[in-house]
A protein has these predicted regions:
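Structural detector for short beta-strands of small beta-barrel domains
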Residues: 2, 8-47, 74-80
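Beta-strand/loop nucleic-acid-binding surfaces
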Residues: 47-72, 84
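OB-fold/S1-family single-stranded nucleic acid-binding modules
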Residues: 50-56, 79-104
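Small/flexible residues
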Residues: 5, 38, 50, 63, ...
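Compositionally biased amphipathic helical and low-complexity segments enriched in hydrophobic
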Residues: 11, 23, 60-61, 97, ...
């Protein structure tokens, strides 16, 4: 039940706050900035954490082996992997590859 409650709250947040989310960068281009972690979940299949984060009102998605608490801000450098839609709600989301995270 707690997972469903968490997912429902996240869906509502994405629907309201990130409705106007835009893609950042072109595919294959390097990007950098400061992101705030919005959601995370651990995939036991890949043994990695999947993160959804906010960059100036736009959603990004990436994988990382380190656990980062939700709400924490991180500086990042990465390459744009793909442009797509969020899995919970149809808003624009940029998938990143080769992500390096730094302290803010």
């Amino acid at each position: 039940i707690s997972r469903e409650t968490k997912e429902g709250a996240l869906k509502k947040t994405i629907r309201t706050e990130y409705r106007d989310s835009l893609y950042i960068g072109g595919i294959g281009e390097p990007v950098e900035g400061v992101c705030k972690i919005v959601d995370s979940y651990f995939s036991s299949h890949y043994e990695r954490y999947s993160y959804t984060a906010d960059v100036m009102g736009n959603l990004i998605r990436f994988w990382n082996k380190f656990e980062i608490p939700v709400g924490e801000r991180k500086k990042f450098k990465a390459k744009v992997k793909a442009h797509g839609k969020n899995r919970l709600f149809e808003v624009n989301e940029t998938a990143l590859n080769y992500v390096r995270l730094y302290k803010v």
